């Protein structure tokens, strides 16, 4: 008889993990061909933004139907992302505040995956850097002082409006 087992994560997170597997394969292939590690990491970062940037941009454009305010839209979008894509075993603690979209990620399966593959340095380029590009696309700045990828206990996300010149 066929036994059905439940996958360890949702379809959305499963898709992201599969894409990260492709990142590891491309990174290793680039290194095997003699590409310097820094250049291979930049290659992954560039390609990932080309893949993930357009749907993130579309989501932000559609969020205009909810509000004209960038922070309201960013809060709605990050909540949606954690409901659909960044599901368990991701763990997030939201910090209610009026001047920012603030939350901490306390468990990151992407950082764990890259570490388990022996390429923890790839996490920053394949995943973390996209957060800053996403914030810029939304007209916000991401203030982050620590990441799990850098061996901290959490990733602190603070999406804030850009500082305006005085």
Summary of predicted features, one role per range:
Residues 1-99, 109, 114-126, 141, ...:
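N-terminal accessory segment detector
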Residues 132:
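Ligand-binding pocket scaffold of soluble enzyme catalytic domains
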Residues 101-105:
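Short, aliphatic-rich beta-strand segments
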Residues 157:
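Conserved SAM-binding loop
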């Amino acid at each position: 008889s066929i036994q059905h087992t439940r996958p360890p994560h949702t379809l959305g997170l499963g898709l992201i993990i599969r894409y990260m597997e492709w990142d590891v394969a491309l990174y290793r292939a680039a290194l095997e061909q003699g590409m310097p590690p820094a250049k291979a990491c930049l290659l992954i970062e560039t390609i990932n933004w080309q893949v993930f940037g357009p749907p993130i941009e579309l989501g932000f454009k559609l969020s205009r139907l909810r509000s004209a305010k960038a922070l309201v839209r960013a809060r709605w979008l990050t909540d949606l992302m954690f409901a659909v894509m960044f599901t368990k075993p991701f763990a997030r603690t939201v910090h209610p505040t009026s001047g920012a979209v603030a939350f901490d990620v306390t468990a990151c399966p992407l950082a764990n995956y890259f570490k388990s593959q022996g390429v923890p340095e790839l996490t920053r380029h394949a995943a973390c850097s996209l957060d800053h590009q996403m914030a810029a696309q939304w007209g916000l700045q991401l203030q982050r002082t620590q990441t799990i990828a850098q061996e901290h206990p959490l990733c602190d996300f603070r999406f804030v409006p850009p500082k305006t010149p005085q």
